[in-house]
Amino acid sequence: MRTADATADRCRDVYEIIEPDQRFAGKDRGIMLLEEKFLEFHRYASSHNLPLEAISVGDENKVLCEMHYAANAPRNIYSHTKSFTVTAVGLAMEEGKLSLEDHVAEVFEDKLPSNPDPNLEKIQLKHLLCMSSGFGKALLMNADRRPGIGAPDYEKYMMAQPVPVEPGSAFCYSSADSILAAHMVERAVGKRMGEYLYEKVFQPLDMGWPLWEHDPQGHPNGGGGMYLTCTEMMKLGQLYLAEGNWKGKQIVSRDWVQEVSTPKFTFEPSADPWHVGYGYQFWISPYPGSYRADGAFGQITTILPEKGLVVSIQCPERGNFDQVKRALHEHFLMEL
């Protein structure tokens, strides 16, 4: 395990002992400035004991800067997983197997109760993707799944829920929306999400086969529970930064990249500078044209198209993530 102190020592060796002219010899000035800002943030993080496990910065093709404050091992990325789910949705749509207008009640007709809520038939895939299903509360979150709420059949459980809010009219963050969207993909393509994403995304991006939480019926959890390293997590951001292209191969359509990153809901200004808006399974960030995949406790990939950069961080479940978020915002992302 590389400690923060050890990392700081290595940085001093690389950045402080070498003369500036030698330090940046042959490098693009933009990379030089990025490395300086990255090191400044690292020093701030170390001196303030920020609860960080890793931070990576990349462009479309490669990792530019990286620091680890804990073992470089796959960890739970929580709701960052949702952005992989919407990637699968886009792939299935491009194959003509799925549509944003598809109705949940029709797809899961075999799981409907005898007296479903009348609003259930109004819910479409597009409502699930922007968290406006109308169920009106957070469902199938980690705190629900752990004690077995909804088990063994999440589809049957959700079809029996009341829908008190007009679908599409209000934002309500819920993992159940993402889980249903993932199940719609599976029914459309005839494969489990893990297999589908492995063929279409994980394998082309050299990510292997990630460990992933499954429900009691064997469905991968479309709302969370995927395990990745920081740089593996960042690869999704690099794919979107490159408008769906990976090393010359178009993986996701440019139109879908634009669609998911366009705000479907915008929020009133608040004390949280990151609470800006929501697209399709991506949050909108407060930097020009930027958006992010965002998982609990600080598993975040921020895509900065105007800067040509992606920034990913991973944080432990313990500690004050708000402190990390403020520092990342004020001492790094705003400085780029």
Predicted regions mapped to residue ranges:
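A short, well-structured edge-of-sheet supersecondary motif
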Residues: 37-71, 100, 301-302, 308-312
